[in-house]
Amino acid sequence: MSRHLWKNQLSEMVQPSGGPAEDQDMLGEESSLGKPAMLHLPSEQGTPETLQRCLEENQELRDAIRQSNQMLRERCEELLHFQVSQREEKEFLMCKFQEARKLVERLSLEKLDLRRQREQALEDLEHLKKCQQQMAEDKASVKAQVTSLLGELQESQSRLEAATKERQTLEGRIRAVSEQVRQLESEREVLQQQHSVQVDQLRMQNQSVEAALRMERQAASEEKRKLAQLQAAYHQLFQDYDSHIKSSKGMQLEDLRQQLQQAEEALVAKQELIDKLKEEAEQHKIVMETVPVLKAQADIYKADFQAERHAREKLVERKELLQEQLEQLQREFNKLKVGCHESARIEDMRKRHVETSQPPLLPAPAHHSFHLALSNQRRSPPEEPPDFCCPKCQYQAPDMDTLQIHVMECIE
């Protein structure tokens, strides 16, 4: 209501003056307000010059009033435009305030989502640590099995050396028996009738020796079969261990890479959004200073931005920690591969030595088994000397001990 009355007063103020009567009234009012009544003269003293001067002054006053009315109209229009602009600016600020509130809510939801993702990443990390501990335990058990197999290999090699020495002893005895056979061949025809009983006894002893040799050969074949079973079990264990390590580490590395990539993409998108919002906040900083509510919301948004930056720094540190753990796992995996390759090389060397070795023979009495030794010497071809060769650098060793020492140094 007061605004309507004020507009009516303004419209009355800006109305143009009517005529001379109104001019005289205005002059009278001016004189009543304290101004000197210069034009209020008695009629008997009026002259044309005085009347002309009064008319000129009246015209000047009318022009001044018209100019003042024009200025009042312009000021009124400016005031109306200012009110409209203030109303539009208020609506614009309210719209921006609603947008900022929605944006803060959306950022809060994204913050909760990132917090859940971080918790999931922590759970995955705990699972990875447990898997790593399990792998370390499996590695220790496999190392213990490899150590036991190496001990069995060394024991087999020592047995092989003992059998080689026994074979050399038997060869010497065979040579001595051959000499005795040549000496006894000359006497055989003379003593054949006298020693028929002894020949029967020797034949029986020969049969017993052959039975003992067959039992020894069966025992040697059984040991070979057990050794082959151990080799097959070791090879299968190595394959299972290798496949288990490859599958588990491949899946873990792929999951870690995907999680890291997702976290990086989320951080990049969040940083772009934060930069964009920061630019908009800088642009509307002057406008927001006039509105206390928006200023409080901006302070809240700034606190959220600082929290998001702190969370982003923590995520970056977490990413670096995961990257270091990934590199450590890769180094351990490479060490395991190198150890497996070395074990495979030792196994190949052991297989070569087992294939080149011969089954041991039992020593037989010289005076009871010369017929059997002579027949074996005639049937069997001459044996080749053992090949003590390094499988890596082809080094020719004089004996098995030297070859073992060289192989360990060559592998290291």
From Swiss-Prot:
Residues 249-412 are annotated as: Required for interaction with TNFAIP3. Phosphorylation at Ser-68 attenuates aminoterminal homodimerization. Polyubiquitinated on Lys-278 via 'Lys-63'-linked ubiquitin; the ubiquitination is mediated downstream of NOD2 and RIPK2 and probably plays a role in signaling by facilitating interactions with ubiquitin domain-containing proteins and activates the NF-kappa-B pathway. Polyubiquitinated on Lys-278 and Lys-302 through 'Lys-63'-linked ubiquitin; the ubiquitination is mediated by BCL10, MALT1 and TRAF6 and probably plays a role in signaling by facilitating interactions with ubiquitin domain-containing proteins and activates the NF-kappa-B pathway. Residues 49-343 form a coiled coil. Residues 1-197 are annotated as: Required for interaction with and ubiquitination by MARCHF2. Pfam families: CC2-LZ, NEMO, zf_C2H2_10. The modification Phosphoserine is found at S31, S43, S68, S85, S369, S380. It is found in: Cytoplasm; Nucleus. Residues 375-412 are annotated as: Interaction with CYLD. Homodimer; disulfide-linked. Component of the I-kappa-B-kinase (IKK) core complex consisting of CHUK, IKBKB and IKBKG; probably four alpha/CHUK-beta/IKBKB dimers are associated with four gamma/IKBKG subunits. The IKK core complex seems to associate with regulatory or adapter proteins to form a IKK-signalosome holo-complex. The IKK complex associates with TERF2IP/RAP1, leading to promote IKK-mediated phosphorylation of RELA/p65. Part of a complex composed of NCOA2, NCOA3, CHUK/IKKA, IKBKB, IKBKG and CREBBP. Interacts with COPS3, CYLD, NALP2, TRPC4AP and PIDD1. This is NF-kappa-B essential modulator. The gene is Ikbkg.
